[in-house]
């Protein structure tokens, strides 16, 4: 495991692995209930949108991915204009702005994503 994050209500923990897999775990049962395998390199950061319907992950593969926690699918992939390895990720309190830090270029990349806060 390379990183983890607990959802604010304490019901779910998400983990990012060096194998590129993002897993969601039930705190009550202790079981993994979904595994996303879209990343091709180590996951370096995990963040939840404030509404809890989206979990985001950053990776050394140069992508930031948004996963739907209801339908269990990768519905959006963010990349930079040039290849970069992402080392961390964060989302603001409104759920509209995603920030990811590049570890090889020492830059912060921002995406404005109004669609992530839709009900």
Located regions from the model:
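Conserved strand-to-loop turn within each blade of WD40 beta-propeller repeats
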Residues: 15-19, 58-61, 101-104
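Short coil turn/linker residues within repeat-based beta-strand modules
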Residues: 29-31, 71-73, 105, 115-117
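WD40-repeat beta-propellers
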Residues: 22-25, 64-68, 107-113
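Short C-terminal beta-strands that terminate individual repeats in beta-propeller domains
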Residues: 32-38, 74-81, 119
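Canonical WD40 repeat/beta-propeller blade segments in eukaryotic WD-repeat proteins
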Residues: 1-6, 41-47, 83-91
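Residue-level detector of Asp-centered blade-edge/turn motifs that repeat once per structural unit
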Residues: 8-9, 50-51, 93-94
């Amino acid at each position: 495991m390379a990183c983890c994050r607990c959802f604010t209500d304490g019901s779910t923990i998400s983990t990012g692995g060096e194998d590129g897999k993002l897993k969601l775990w039930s705190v009550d049962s202790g079981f993994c209930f979904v595994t996303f395998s879209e990343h091709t390199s180590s996951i370096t950061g995990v963040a939840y949108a404030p509404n809890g319907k989206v979990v985001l992950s950053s990776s050394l593969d140069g992508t930031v991915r948004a996963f739907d926690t209801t339908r269990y699918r990768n519905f959006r992939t963010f990349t930079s204009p040039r290849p970069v390895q992402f080392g961390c990720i964060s989302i603001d309190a409104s759920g509209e702005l995603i920030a990811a830090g590049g570890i090889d270029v020492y830059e912060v990349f921002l995406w404005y994503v109004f669609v992530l806060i839709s009900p």
